[in-house]
């Protein structure tokens, strides 16, 4: 459902109405010496992009793009004024506000003070609804313009945003359902949320806030499962979130449960969208719920056929009775199947380190997939473990993250951790020993880098039976005091001779920003690169998975310079290597990526950025690139890739 807001401007020219789309990706505005003469809008509908143009005199063109579909336009503003000799008003300038809290440059004419020239206007939905289309009037110029915004359908149950009035309002709208939720924190508050919605067969992501710490995720088994309840707390900002589903599952609590509590829940309804307010944190959160579809009635059983009686058979004369054979001996009863032995319980190995802090115990899982380690001034201040249990990912985090961020160690799918080396030391200001460094070793012989500062006292955390590490426990507060683990027996069904299909090539660049990893997909469809004044400020990648195009998270921060696009002819074209440069720039502590160039099996892209500094190349012969990882803050500090073998089909001719 949409809300049509009245057009601002003059009453000449011919009326136009583009109608309602799924969203707006890009707006191009042209001007002459006096007013706005032309507008070109790139809309998206059901995964396809459509263009609408109004006005005829293109003049001087300027473009405004959003990080679509994560970001969308929430307000349309500008100015209009009467033009001498025309007898009516024309649009003199346009500007746009987005769900990221960004405001576009003024596209058109300004005053000497840099404000829109003429009578200013700002058109927006009451709750920050998404821009879905434009209407207005045009001839040789743009006479008037108005927007269509998303509006809540009367069949939906709308929960108004709970929280403060800071930040910018946004409303993602209503979809078929929710596939995944990602929640990121910054200290005690929720600073970032990303929702992956279902729209038919497509996945539509929307992100809000500022990504700082690595987000945690909650995956819904859509379409077999849906979210029935959203619970959270507000303490000035959003401080925690929790979800319940139709299968009786409850997500982990994301954040700290402090402040006033809210619950969004409606019997026989399911969650289909979110709204709220955000800036550098999530100020407020609301939701849209839709009624569950009525269950399809079971078909009535077909009536059973009426049996037709067969004619009575004529009895044949009875033969002479044969002598009865001796009865066969009864077969011996089959032996009862031997029940499979119950798996041995995991072995809990005592924590190594000091006695400070609070005890934590994550328990035992099927696998440890990834470890994040954050350093402090004196040792390991923070750890986060990413586990897998029955195919589902869970996380446990302990300690306190510092401004130094985190480093990570990822375990390949055909490998597992067998031991950890724990360095401990007595550090001034702490009453007991603390963990100063961690090193992890795996079954395939991989040894991680030392995370932290190694000390003379090194302790080995293992069970002595060749077991597989499946969970952690220990003690922590503002630092990690002690670390122990659970080990499960293994039959070594995983062998080092079976390599993982995908290779993760080490990221190149500086050590600033927060780690990110998009993961492994079938291929790459499109790359968007945004430049800053001194290097690459922003990247995002559109991947392919099965039959779906999936737009990954944006990494870095977009600037007013916008983005440039490199689009592949997928699936016949694929990336074979990434080349680039990284360098130290004034005012930034760690090196940043200054340039990126992408090579495919068909061509080479233009260089995005400035080719200055240390050169690098990410390439594996016989492999194609199917995912990216790295580090980013306000700039892109590192870039790395995931690559898989290229398989070629050969035809034999006889």
UniProtKB/Swiss-Prot annotation:
Region called Disordered, residue ranges: 314-355
Tissue specificity: Expressed in flowers. Detected mainly in ovules and styles of immature flowers, but also in pistils, styles, stamens, petals and embryos. Not detected in leaves.
Pro residues composition bias: residue spans: 314-346
Induction comment: Not regulated by wounding, dehydration stress, methyl jasmonate, salicylic acid or abscisic acid treatments.
An MF annotation (GO) of this entry: carbohydrate binding
Keywords: Lectin, Repeat
Domain Jacalin-type lectin: 2-151, 156-291, 346-489, 502-645
Xref: Pfam families: Jacalin (PF01419)
PANTHER family: JACALIN-RELATED LECTIN 3, MYROSINASE-BINDING PROTEIN 2
Family: Belongs to the jacalin lectin family.
Protein name per its UniProtKB record: Myrosinase-binding protein 2
Organism in which the protein naturally occurs: Arabidopsis thaliana (Mouse-ear cress)
């Amino acid at each position: 459902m949409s809300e049509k807001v009245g057009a601002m401007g003059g009453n000449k020219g011919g009326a136009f109405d583009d109608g309602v789309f799924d969203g707006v990706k890009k707006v191009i505005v042209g001007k002459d010496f006096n007013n706005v003469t032309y507008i070109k809008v790139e809309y998206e509908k059901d995964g396809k992009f459509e263009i609408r143009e109004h006005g005829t005199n293109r003049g001087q063109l300027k473009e405004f793009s959003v990080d679509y579909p994560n970001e969308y336009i929430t307000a349309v503003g500008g100015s209009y004024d009467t033009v001498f000799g025309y007898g009516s008003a024309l649009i003199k300038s346009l500007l746009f506000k987005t769900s990221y809290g960004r405001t576009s440059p003024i596209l058109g004419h300004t005053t000497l003070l840099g404000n829109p020239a003429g009578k200013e206007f700002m058109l927006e939905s009451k709750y920050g609804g998404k821009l879905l289309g434009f209407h207005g009037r045009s001839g040789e110029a743009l006479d008037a313009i108005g927007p269509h915004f998303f509006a809540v359908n009367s069949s939906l149950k709308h929960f108004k945003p709970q929280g403060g009035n800071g930040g910018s309002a946004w409303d993602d709208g209503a979809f078929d359902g929710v596939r995944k939720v990602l929640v990121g924190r910054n200290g005690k508050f929720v600073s970032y949320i990303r929702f992956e919605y279902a729209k038919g067969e497509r996945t539509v992501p929307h992100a809000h806030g500022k990504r700082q710490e690595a987000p945690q995720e909650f995956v819904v088994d859509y379409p077999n499962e849906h979210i029935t309840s959203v619970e959270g707390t507000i303490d000035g900002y959003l401080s925690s979130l929790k979800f319940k589903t139709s299968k009786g599952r409850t997500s982990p609590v994301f954040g700290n449960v402090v402040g006033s509590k809210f619950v969004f829940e409606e019997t026989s309804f399911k969650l289909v969208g979110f709204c709220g307010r955000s800036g550098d944190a999530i100020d407020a959160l609301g939701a849209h719920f839709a009624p569950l579809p009525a269950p399809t009635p079971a078909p009535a059983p077909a009536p059973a056929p009426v049996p037709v009686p067969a004619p009575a058979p004529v009895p044949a004369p009875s033969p002479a009775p044969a002598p009865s054979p001796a009865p066969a001996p009864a077969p011996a009863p089959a032996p009862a199947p031997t029940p499979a032995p119950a798996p041995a319980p995991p072995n809990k190995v005592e924590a190594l380190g000091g006695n400070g802090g609070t005890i934590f115990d994550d328990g035992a899982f099927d696998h440890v997939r990834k470890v994040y380690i954050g350093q402090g001034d004196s040792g390991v201040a923070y750890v986060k473990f990413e586990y897998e249990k029955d195919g589902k990912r869970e996380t446990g985090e302990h300690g306190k993250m510092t401004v130094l961020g985190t480093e990570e160690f990822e375990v390949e799918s055909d490998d597992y951790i067998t031991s950890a080396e724990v360095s401990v030391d007595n550090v001034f200001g702490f009453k007991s020993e603390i963990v100063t460094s961690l090193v992890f070793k795996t079954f395939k012989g991989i040894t991680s880098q030392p995370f932290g500062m190694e000390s003379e006292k090194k302790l080995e955390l293992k069970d002595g039976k060749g077991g597989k590490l499946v969970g952690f426990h220990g003690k922590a507060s503002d630092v990690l005091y002690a670390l122990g683990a659970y080990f499960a027996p293994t039959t070594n069904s995983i062998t080092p001779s079976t390599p993982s299909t995908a290779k993760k090539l080490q990221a190149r660049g500086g050590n600033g920003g927060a780690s990110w990893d998009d993961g492994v997909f079938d291929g790459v469809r499109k790359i968007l690169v945004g430049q800053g004044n001194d290097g690459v400020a922003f990247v995002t990648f559109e991947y392919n998975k099965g039959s779906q195009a999936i737009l990954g998270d944006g990494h870095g921060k977009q600037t007013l310079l916008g983005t440039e696009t490199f689009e592949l002819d997928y699936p016949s074209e694929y990336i074979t290597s990434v080349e680039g440069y990284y360098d130290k720039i004034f005012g930034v502590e760690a090196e940043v990526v200054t340039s990126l160039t992408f090579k495919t099996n068909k061509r080479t892209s233009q260089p995005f950025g400035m080719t200055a500094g240390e050169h690098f190349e990410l390439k594996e012969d016989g492999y194609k690139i199917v995912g990216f990882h790295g580090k980013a803050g306000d700039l892109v500090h590192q870039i790395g890739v995931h690559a898989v073998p290229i398989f070629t089909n050969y035809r034999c001719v006889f």
